[in-house]
Amino acid sequence: MTEAAEATLSADIQLIQRIIPHRYPFLLVDRVRDIVPNKSAVGIKCVTMNEPQFTGHFPGLPIFPGVQIIEAMAQTSAVLVGVSMDLADKGAKVYFMGIDGAKFRRKVVPGDVLEMTVTVKRGGGKVWKFEGRASVDGELAAEAEFSAMLDLPKG
């Protein structure tokens, strides 16, 4: 692990955008804190009524889609990989490969602050496996295990 990775305990939106390619409307993590390289991190998503998915999910009853909670956990994991391997500005991509055991436990609505805790189960090479738990005010909203593949640019 590089000295820069060891010194980074959090990632603001500028660093997140230097690590992962996602942008509005599909950038689903605002900040990542408590980064322990190669081990764990906590992503933060502030859910607002301005989210574009609320126009159809559901009119008059805005509920943040469960699949986007899983995607937010995956993006948090990609930032963890990027910090762990010092990948900012290097054009690396972390591709979501699979998901197991996804469960949704509570609605996430505008005004909620979603915290995604991700833990590395296996990693350090091209394929990583994670366990993720998303919560609001300490109450479990969703959980899943998922895997991702690291794609480094050639050359």
From Swiss-Prot:
Predominant location category: cytoplasm
Enzyme class label: lyase
EC number, UniProt record: 4.2.1.59
Lipid metabolism among keywords: yes
Location in or out of the cell: Cytoplasm
SUPFAM superfamilies in UniProt: Thioesterase/thiol ester dehydrase-isomerase
UniProt protein name: 3-hydroxyacyl-[acyl-carrier-protein] dehydratase FabZ
